[in-house]
Amino acid sequence: MNDYRRFLTFVFLLMISGSAALAQELMKVAGLVVDQNADPLIGVTVRVQGDNKGGTVTDMDGNFTIHVQKGKTLVFSYLGYKNKEVLANSSKLKITLHEDNKVLDDVVVVGYGVQKKSSVTGAISQVKKEDMENRTITNAKSALQGKTAGVQIVSSSARPGSSPTVRIRGFSSNGSSDPLYVVDGVRLGDISGIDPNDIASMEVLKDAASAAIYGAEAGNGVVLITTKKGTVGSGKITYDFQYAIESLAKKPKLLNAEEYIQYMKEGKTFTEDYLLKNWDGTTNTSWVDAIYGKGKMQKHNLGFTGGNQNGNYYLSLTYLDNDGMVKGSNDLYRRLTATINAEYQIKPWLKVGTTNQIEKYNARSVSEGNEYGSMMAAVLSMDPLTPVAYEGGNLPVHVASALANGKHLLTNAAGNYYGVSAFYAGEQFNPFVMRDNSVSRNSGFNVNGSIYADFKPIKDLVITSRFGYRLSGTRSSSTSLPFYGNATQSRDYVDQSASSSTSIYYQWENFANYMKKLGDHTVNAMVGMSFQESTYDYVQGGLQSNGEDAVKKNNPLFYYLNFASASATKSVGGEKTRSAKYSYFGRLSYDYRNRYYLQASLRADAADLSKLPATNRWGYFPAVSGGWTISEEKFFEPLRDVVTSLKLRASWGQNGSLAALSGYAYSTDMAQGGIYPLVPGNNYTTSVSPSSMGNDKLKWETSEQTDLGIDALLFAGRMNFSMDYFVKKTKDLLVSGTTPSLVIGGTTSPINAGNVSNKGFEFELGWRDNIGDFSYSVRGNLATLKNEVTYLDPSLTRLQGTTFMNVPLTYFEKGYPVYYFRGYQFTGIDPKTGDPTFADLNDSGDLTDDDKMDLGSAIPNFTYGITLTAAYKGFDLAVFGSGASGNKIFNCINRTDFPMVNKMKELFYDDRWTESNPNGSKPRAGANNMDKYATSSAMVYDGSYFKIKQIQLGYSLPRTLLKKVAINNLRLYVSLDDFFTITKYPGFDPEVSTNDVVGMGIDKGGYPTSRKVVMGFNLEF
């Protein structure tokens, strides 16, 4: 019994001593984790090496506490930074983590998946969130400008809320050349409702091999947008504020009163007596200064983000209020957007998530871009002798007469009547009257997003099911008010119109990704299917006045269709359309030792009968690509100290497009005609005949593209370089207007009858480095482009495009760029008469259409962009510029069929022919053939430009100061946006165009670009 007790006592003492020894070895380690700039890192994982279950994370100040046995190794890991291992031999640690540039840049988004950047074999460019943050852009498309080679941004207007057009590797069609936008896997026709602040990255799929997985929708390239998601770590609250003051970037020089009088007298447009009789002798109106003032923009963004190992969330709310430069309240854009993203790992084999973007907007805008009556054109056309308004009630005779005859003269806020020109009575009149003679309301909403689930039934296999949706609606109304602009432009009664549209789109996609690594071999396979359906409902109504107002009372409360007056003529119309598409797709990739890469993909798309006949509804779009990382070869080892990585790429593929097709364009339609007495008596029979001929052979437009590329990293990754050469051939363009049958007559349906070629080089070069506390980077890109129509149906010599004063200016013709400029070649001024002269190319003695020639193209020979950044301690500087060269602009602002309109000095007044200046380079005032002059090479200008889009200086307050008030980060900044432009173009802005491909480079007086002084701050809790 005593022996047993002694044994138990021994065991008890042994356990106590062992526990004491263990307690002595287990120690508390506390510390701080910072980055290279000594800023705390939040959410860094701290664990004991070999223990994958325990551990901790750093708090919002970068601090951590962990209990560990002395001598064990602690591992510190954080996304985007290199892991660090430290022995636990001290109770206090300060850990500095360094960015892992390879990790930060290693992944790019591709169709239905992601790829390591090192394994990409196609031409993919990436724009990161850093390129969009703190810019005054309100549209995500603008973030692409100058940031990646081969992408051109074309703007038809700079009005608040306007959306530019994106062109990837040229212009491939006589119809739409817009790329496909895919936001978090959901296809969108427009991304204007996505706030740039909510975007994590944008990938531009430029070559056919990268975009072929989207098949029939990818003929003009693809832009993949990934919105922000939550990150692992403690939650963050952010608030970003931005305020901008806008003013005209450039003021065109117009004739002042003295110059206008002189020019009118020289041209015998008006006699001196008439001019002096109808001018008060003092008025010298600058309509540009009168109508444009200071615009303002403010933007607020509130964000919440966070997550853990199982899930994350990102919530964002943005409000934008942009009051444009046109004085008054008819030039504004207000938008409220929200982003709600979340995902959660429910089981080790199941992850679910959702992405959602919501937009609500209201807009008012002024008329622009139309030579036949727009406010913007009126600013450049109105004479300087007419006042903005008549002060003191002193009305000239012609105005008093109009008032006495019951005309509705509008007044300003002070009750003074707006000025009415006694010299010009065309489509343009006082810009303030054009601004105020109607009340327009435009509003709408967009809701788009997805719900998805990722299943992992076995190792290396992920099956994704994703339902995407897009709902949008627009509401607009226009009240045309009584006004008097001049003797030819007036309205006596109120008219009312309104429209409403709703669009519903959904897609359901199921696809599987399988990745298997077998020794040195890695295989990735993806297969899937997709179904898409969209519906569109549209309804419109109108009230036309008949001897009295079309509404019961001329009051804003009655500007609705349901307040129609008894005499109003009512009209209503509308339509509903539906289309659907079914698809199968697959991709196979092979990688050997990160050295050799092969990839092949195929997509099969089937359009429904609303687009194509049953015989041609299926389209097949294959692609292959390969890559060779030469730097992984043994023979390359001597060069690796300089060239870190060098890869060659090659790809070929096909994509399609149906953008130029309307519903049932291939069908033969019948229409009722006249009535005929084909039987005796008074019985008449209504005739029916084909209104269109139909085309059961109609098929997809197809783009075929070959790409050769080089990617290189040099000097330990500090320098990166890429180059691509591409040849893109688009065939079977959809063309209308071919010659119909002379027997049957009627109009023809579209046929596949055109081919276009685009080819060029793309270069991207970057350098980044740091010298102590000073870091800097330089990035530049340049792209060349040669565009040509290579085939057009023999029945068509050329297709007409945009006109000016009813004269066609642009054409689609074999052997020339898409919609090039065509007109008379101006050869100079006849020194005897002062009239313009033109080249008589066929020596007929008369100027005919056969004498017109190629006057250039709006497509640049090359585009480029450059970005400079620098940072020193808390200060940071960013400078960004972009430009284009070789493009032409057709100036169509000044109407020569109305010689009494005002003139741009550089175009008509300076160095004009006079008796004392017989060698002048501009026609005399009142010259003959001015209609031909206005549509000749004389009005075609070099559109090359370089713009410094942004100069921004920021300062981040020290964290040691901010932590005392529970603030994690506070950055203040000021910026000058679009302040400096180098160009020879005399108009408002060299970045001009009409709103479609047929009017590229045509300047008809669009809303001009503003320059902005910007102030803002970024706050993070």
Language model region names:
Residues 1-339, 344-353, 448-449, 774, ...:
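Short, small/polar-rich motifs associated with maturation and membrane association
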Residues 38, 62, 185, 392-393, ...:
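Detector for glycine-centered tight turns/loop "hinges" at secondary-structure junctions
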Residues 843, 877-946:
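C-terminal beta-barrel architecture of Gram-negative outer-membrane proteins
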Residues 238-280, 367-376, 539-547, 664-665, ...:
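Conserved small-residue
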